[in-house]
Amino acid sequence: MEPVITRFPPSPTGDLHIGGARTALFNWLFARHFGGRFILRIEDTDLVRSTESSIKAILDAMEWLSLDWDEGPYYQTKRLDVYKDYLQRMVDGGAAYYCDCAPDDLERRRKSAMAEGRKPKYDGRCRDRGLGPGPDRVLRFRCPDSGTTVLNDIIKGPIFFENAELDDLVLQRSDGMPTYNFAVVVDDVTMNITHVIRGDDHVNNTPRQILIYQALGARLPYFAHVPMILGEDRARLSKRHGATSVMAYRDMGILPEALINYLVRLGWSHGDQEIFTRRELIETFSLENVGKSASVFNPEKFLWLNAHYLRERSPEALVPLLQPFLDAKGYPARSPEYVARAIPTLQPRVRTLVEMAEQMRFYLVDEVEYDPEAARKFLVSAMREPFNRLLAELAALDGFSHERLESVFQQIVSELGLKLGKVAQPVRVALTGGTVSPGLFEIIDVLGKDAVLKRLNNALRFIDRQAG
């Protein structure tokens, strides 16, 4: 079997969105599965819309997802001599001709064709005029006016196109730049691409590209067109459905392995398995198991998956990932060891790093702010004696094991004739500022003796002020 070579050719006109990321992932996995090569190519011939910032955003997203490439990135704007050579081959072989039809005249003829019920395609006026290159002239492909072009798609099966329905598409614009359909074929030919895996919005381009391959006498690659991703309303996924760019998900606190796992399952399956390691994905991925119908992006399932990966990561591994989110909130700096001790208390409770950072607040601030309703309900005069007893008992302890803490609390509530909940919830408010948090003994253990005693004393002073 010949070496598998795939490619991912984004246009640098914006961020890398998840549809493009899934395409990159499928190409990457297919190449890695067969021990082949994965090429990154930047399609930047749209000089007006292509930007350096978009190129950087795409490369950053690929690196964040750990989709490494074996060659590239190649830039189409640096390959103009290659396209020029292949354009001349098309002219010399009679497969292309120059056209000087003015844009406004083309538009008038297009509207006339539509008014007469004809397909609004180029009418071939310059086909046999024998024009040479010149100002304001484009180069067009001489499309066969009969016959059928067949796209044998790995995913969709055979698709038939009548050549008479196709257009004499422009291969080279009047400014000398090659068009997408021509440049992509030349790139794939010269880079020996064996498999073209892309979104099914490219299906209608494919017969035109097949005809260009044939005109150049080049071998066709295998084609596989992946169904699109839809929002929950079954419309094509867009910004109105929420975040769609890869880096936006990073900024939401999503882990790259969670995004990889979710994207690959949007359209591909391997039995009933939901969770995959990267090694498992490489071993099991195949185009035969890509579905033919569109996939629906489910935000809740995605967050469930991210929560799974957050729980699977060790606290020590999460610290550097979490730290930028803590810094963004302006929390006081704490040692990595301290943050790592707090993380296990939050891992079962959060779905993103942003949520973890938000819930980490009470561990990091010097003084907690009380939720007004919680303070009104729980930080009351009746808590003076339990808090003072707790201060004395905790100050006398050498360490805060769960067994010791439970013994202290049980002893105090028993002696005061109270139920544990009547004391535990006010203590929770004193230590965290609110009524919802990880387990109380876990919190005390992480905060440590000094912070716990300080917060209990602060709560007593608050109670005194309220009573005064």
Curated annotation (Swiss-Prot):
GO cellular component: a single term: cytosol
Motif ('KMSKS' region): 236-240
Gene Ontology MF annotations: ATP binding; glutamate-tRNA ligase activity; tRNA binding; zinc ion binding
Chain sites annotated for binding ATP: K239
Disulfide bonds: none
A biological-process GO annotation: glutamyl-tRNA aminoacylation
Binding residue positions for Zn(2+): C99, C101, C126, D128
Domain of life: Bacteria
Catalyzed reactions: tRNA(Glu) + L-glutamate + ATP = L-glutamyl-tRNA(Glu) + AMP + diphosphate
Co-factor: note: Binds 1 zinc ion per subunit.
Subunit organization: Monomer.
Family the UniProt entry places it in: Belongs to the class-I aminoacyl-tRNA synthetase family. Glutamate--tRNA ligase type 1 subfamily.
Function: Catalyzes the attachment of glutamate to tRNA(Glu) in a two-step reaction: glutamate is first activated by ATP to form Glu-AMP and then transferred to the acceptor end of tRNA(Glu).
NCBIfam families, A to Z: gltX_bact (TIGR00464)
Record protein name field: Glutamate--tRNA ligase
Species of provenance: Syntrophobacter fumaroxidans (strain DSM 10017 / MPOB)
